[in-house]
Amino acid sequence: ACNQKTETTLTLSGLDPVKFQTTVNDAQTQLYTLKNKAGMEVCITNFGGRIVSIMVPDKNGVMQDVVLGFDSIADYINIPSDFGASIGRYANRINQGKIVLDGDTIQLPQNNFGHCLHGGPKGWQYQVYSANPIDSTTLELTRISPDGDENFPGNVTAKVLFKLTDDNAI
């Protein structure tokens, strides 16, 4: 019997979109590719709202990937990092993981030497965003963070819009 091979279309940077498909917290991860008329390519995963690769021409016109990242969603999950991610609820460090709101002290998770860094150990960089591909150059990602998410107060809806222009700007 013959085995049929399934052809996989790789991105310009050599990424296999299949390697970015998995389920995290009951949500499906994907790789999205934006391309412009100039040939530039930006690859984004909805896991953490991350830019995974950016292919741009160097001074000699040779396309080069200028992003430090991984080749699969498994690496982003198993080797925790903030590479290319959208950070939230808070970017940077909150001293001792404590905030005061209306006179009440709120203790946030401490994930960085006794401090809360980039929204805590389950920050937005480790969550799956809802994706809305608008056209070949535009992707909108949405993250809904309910009250109490990592002990942060209030409901937050965050939208990240990635737009690749024909003059190679994002």
Model-derived segments and their meaning:
Residues 3-170:
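Surface-exposed acidic/polar loop and edge beta-strand patches at domain peripheries
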